[in-house]
Every structure is written in C-alpha cells, then in structure tokens.
Amino acid sequence: MTDAPVSRIRNFCIIAHIDHGKSTLADRLLQDTGTVANRDMQEQFLDNMDLERERGITIKLQAARMNYTATDGQQYVLNLIDTPGHVDFSYEVSRSLQACEGALLVVDASQGVEAQTLANVYLALDNDLEIIPVLNKIDLPGADPDRIKEEVEAIIGLDCDNAIPCSAKTGLGVPEILQAVVDRVPPPKDALEEPTKALIFDSYYDPYRGVIVYFRVMSGRISCKDKVLLMASKKTYELDEIGIMAPDQKKVDELHAGEVGYLAASIKAVADARVGDTITLLSAPADEALPGYTEAKPMVFCGLFPTEADQYPDLRDALDKLQLSDAALKYEPETSSAMGFGFRCGFLGLLHMEIVQERLEREYDLDLIVTAPSVIYKVNMIDGSEVMVDNPATLPDPQKRESIEEPYVKMEIYAPNEYNGALMGLCQERRGEYIDMKYITTDRVTLIYELPLAEVVTDFFDQMKTRTQGYASMEYSLIGYRKNQLVRLDVLINGERADALTTIVHQDKAYNVGKALVEKLKELIPRQQFKIPIQASIGSRIIASTSISAIRKDVLAKCYGGDISRKKKLLKKQAKGKKRMKAMGKVDVPQEAFMAVLKLNDGGGS
C-alpha cells in the first residue's frame, strides 16, 4: 500500500436516491482503480447483507480505499465512504458526510432529482463538501441529460456546466469521475501535530473479534499499540489491530490525519462504539469531542410476539444479538392478554422496522406476529406530571389525563405536477396542514405539509406511491409535539380486550375507524362454533359492533325421521354445550387481523 502524504488523499462519498445507481457506480470505481480484481467482482460489492442486495438499498455503511494514478503521474489515495440513501438512516448519512471533503451527486438522467437525494445534498452543503454532479444512466433511451442539468441547477443551485455524464452499467465516464475527484475534491486538513481525534462513522459486530469500528482520523495519528478513549461513552480500550479497507481489511501499523480505517479492540456491543463518537488517545486526550454526536432516538414502536410461546427465549436471544450490530434498535419485554409474552421494540422508521423484522425471521428462523406501529405520545396528567407513552394499550385513563400531544413532522413531497390534487387529497385525509407549494421546474412541484407522525408511519408511503404511479418521493423531519383531541380505541373480541389491536386515533375519525376495523376483523377472524361479538369502544362507550355468526353443526343428521322429543333433546344438549363453549372459548386472532389496523385507510375507513 502506498503511504500517501495528506495532500494526495481524497475522501469522498456518493449521494444518490434509491435506484439511481450508487452501488453500481461504486463497483465501477473499485474495478477501474484495480482495487477489486474483475474475477472477484460481484454486483453491489459494498452491500454485504443479502437483504441489501435484494431490496437494492444500502443499509449499513461501507468504506473502501483505492489507489489511483492521476493524469499528473502522481499516485493518489481515494477513500470512498458509502452512505445509505434512505430517510430512516439520515443520522448515519450525516456522520459519513462529516468524514468526507467531497461528494459525488449521482442523479438518474431519466428520472431527475428525488426527495432523499435533496435531503442528503443539504446535509453535504452544511458540512461544506465539494459536490460533483454526475448524470448516471445516460445509455438509457429515456435519458434527457440537458433537462436534468436544468433541474439540478434550479432545485439545488449547483452549477452543472461541468457535470459528468456517465453510465455505471457500461463503465462510460468512470475515468473522468476519478480524475474529477482528484482535481475538485480538496485534500484533508493537514493536522498531524494536533491532538488525536477520529470520528466513528460506522461499526458492525463480528462474532469472533467483537465490534469492528470504521473511523476517519481528523487530526493526529493512531497506532496499533495505542490505548484509546471513546469520548461520548467514556470507555477505554486497548487496540488489537488497526487497518484499512481495500475493500477487504488489511492491517497497518499507523494511520494519520486524513486517513480512513478500521479498528478492533474486543468491544462487546455496537452501543459502546456509537456512530458519531470521537476516538482519542488515553495518554493524551483531546480537549473536546468532534461536534454533532447525538444518540439515535426511536420514532416508531411496535410489539413483536412469537407465534409459538416456546420461541420467546429464542426471540430474546435474537434481539440481543441484533442489537449488538444495530445500536438504534431498542426493546423491552411486554405481555399481552391476547398474544402472551413478547417485546415492545423501537425503530428509527418504518423501513428500519421492516428490515429488523425480516432479519429476525430470516437470520434467526423465527415466526413473528407484529402489531401495528405506533409513535411516542406525550400525555399531560392532571397532577402536572408528563408521561411518555409508546404503547397505545398503556395510555392513562381519561379521568387522570388533561391532554395528549403527538409528534408532528414537516413533510416535503416532490412529484410531477399532474399528481398535485391526488397528493393534496392524501395529506388532507391524514390531518395534514398545508404550508407551501413551490414549482421547481414547469412540470415538477414541491408540496410542503405538516402532518402528525402517526399518520405517516402506517401506510402513507405506499399510498403516496400508489396515487402517483410511483413518481412522487418524500422526505420528512420532526418539528415537535402538538396537542390534539386524541382518544384510545379499544377492540373487544368475545368481550375481551385485545390489547394488541388498541390504537390511538383522532376523536373526529374514531367512529369511522372503529366501524371499518370491526368490519375488517369480521372478515379475517375464522368462524367458531359459537357466536363471536366484535366491538370497538372508547372508554366504556361502544361505538361500533358486529358479530361473527356461529358455524352450525347438524346434530340431527343421524336422526332419520323418528321421535321429535329425541331431536329436541339433542338440540338442547347442543345449545348447552355452545353456552359453555362461549364462556370458556378463546378466539385465535390471525396475524392478518393485526395488520388490518394498518390497511384501514385503503378501504376508505378513515
């Protein structure tokens, strides 16, 4: 490996919306610089999880070091730091941008700028990164690079005269991109003599070596013999090894300011080496940590229950192991009268929730029932105290509480303007408050709304895509809590409260939601040999009810003609048995019923 001086190091990342070709471009850069031999190449080389490849998204960050000989004959070290493009993982993105001096903005030459790209570009501009626009997929028949250049200039305000046209699929334009990184991205600050500070921009759990931490040295130097201090968690470690990603790990003795590498120090859990934390030397610690560290706060909560009660310990072990590699996942045990033992889990967003659920089912072979997602409500009690509620079933009684506040988000939706009406209708249905509308170009519009987060976490994204035939994209950020007239809607099945089906809804919507929910459950719960009443209630008031009629078992089938009193006796015996069955009978609620709470908005229920 070449030990390049700071002036010949370039740290950059790639910003792109899902599907705009970021991982493919990263593959080409690795191939063109000879970092990965052609025979070892596989698509989406830096996306290590099968789940990432299948969904075509980047979840965990990766990094790769490339050696590149520029047109001036000098050899440069290019560190590519891969970033996730999804809104749920925006904190990880902001940390990886802090580790760079430049960014390639990859825009699909046929689709144009999308919402999440924009959010990440603004983060990049906040971090003073040099942004190089790249128009990808110009080999597609629908590509229109000139229109997209205008769009980028209009929306982001970037000068696109020297935007690089490329096709990551065929490799066209890739050498120009590498040269542009050398020419236009500034080298890191020469801070070798300052106290050592390194930024953690990612970490993952290795079952044999503990947590492997990816970091960028901001100032000073780190050698493999050092003892280090993590400034936010206040933990100290003796280093086992440090090295570089090329893209496979290679040990080195020392890394200095400007370089990107990894370290292993027998760290037990990812939570001990949080993204955004600062590494410094124990012998000569820095005075203050690097700015911008915050702990990931879960936004969306749901209950996870095993379908078989004896799988509960397996689920607990699986969550323990998953938390080692996913510090944003929070969970605590929960019991439910309908479902038995399980866990209440907190996630960054809906995508994060789906991914965790899928990883639990796939990697740990579990069969799970997932309750409808909810958000954290702030309940102001009559005695002046404040209670945070993440499980609708635990909402305090109306007599004890004064008001309920729910989290609101500022939502920006980008779409072609013919879908304007459909999107405004959707936001209105979801209790959205109209803020602004801007025309970006003659045929694309930005809608800005403020909405309750609870209305977004169910199926807002799916509905938005459905109503715009997949053309709209959205981006949201939290703006705080607001008071609303909210009530707890309980569902009673056969007289018993099914706590896993409890939701918190707006008072004006309660009747419609309750009515739609009981009707939906009627379709989904299998018939029994006794009548099952299904009711929706607010407090002690039943607002909607229906019932599933019993299956009639013909006890008279064996009586051919004969005495009427014999038949009466059999029918009486059956009625008695049904009465006992109704009193004792437990109704099994299938998984689809719990998801019914989510799908209500499709059927026009709310």
From Swiss-Prot:
It is a peripheral membrane protein. Pfam families: EFG_C, GTP_EFTU, GTP_EFTU_D2, LepA_C. Residues 7-189 form the tr-type G domain. It is an enzyme of class 3 (hydrolase). It catalyses: GTP + H2O = GDP + phosphate + H(+). GTP binds at residues 19-24, 136-139. GO terms for molecular function: GTP binding; GTPase activity; ribosome binding. Coiled coil: none annotated. SUPFAM superfamilies: EF-G C-terminal domain-like, P-loop containing nucleoside triphosphate hydrolases, Translation proteins. Its EC number is 3.6.5.n1. It is found in: Cell inner membrane. GO terms for biological process: positive regulation of translation; translation. Keywords: Cell inner membrane, Cell membrane, GTP-binding, Hydrolase, Membrane, Nucleotide-binding, Protein biosynthesis. Belongs to the TRAFAC class translation factor GTPase superfamily. Classic translation factor GTPase family. LepA subfamily. Required for accurate and efficient protein synthesis under certain stress conditions. May act as a fidelity factor of the translation reaction, by catalyzing a one-codon backward translocation of tRNAs on improperly translocated ribosomes. Back-translocation proceeds from a post-translocation (POST) complex to a pre-translocation (PRE) complex, thus giving elongation factor G a second chance to translocate the tRNAs correctly. Binds to ribosomes in a GTP-dependent manner. HAMAP family: GUFP, LepA. This is Elongation factor 4. The gene is lepA.
